[in-house]
């Protein structure tokens, strides 16, 4: 893991780059916050003409897109270069129509990092399942996304 200043700079740069990413710009997705310690993120998507579906609510593909990379990115930063981290699978459960701006918050804590390190210490893959809720401005649940990640300690980092 990087030193705190370097990590904070990386967080600011990542937020800036993602906010300029054309698919996010086009969908009205904004990264509002990435924690200086790269353990948290908050993403917002407004409802606009170009991201509405046929019935005038948030397009489901955009709802998924707004949450797609964040657990992978946060874990990559926390675990460091000795680990392989990939998105493996995802599912989204649409609970209620998104009729306005929606938000998602991501949190990576010590317990998750410790579990991943313990499960991968022997060089085997680990498939943590993480969940993120997408909520509207009133805090009502709009969708729930389940993500499965693939995490493995790189061969050169394994103990003999």
Residue spans for each PLM region:
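Non-catalytic linker/capping segments at the edges of enzyme domains
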Residues: 1-42, 160
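HotDog/MaoC-like acyl-thioester-processing domains
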Residues: 3-8, 98-99, 109-160
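Short structured motifs
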Residues: 26-31, 88-94, 115-117
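A generic structural signal for short beta-strands and their flanking turns/coil linkers
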Residues: 27, 39-41, 86-90, 100-104, ...
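Residues located in well-ordered beta-strands
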Residues: 30, 91-93, 105-107, 133, ...
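Short, charged/polar surface micro-motifs in flexible loops or helix N-caps
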Residues: 37, 48-51, 69-71, 110-112
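Hot-dog-fold acyl-thioester-processing enzymes
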Residues: 50-70
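Hydrophobic beta-strand-centered segment that forms part of the acyl-chain substrate-binding groove
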Residues: 74-111
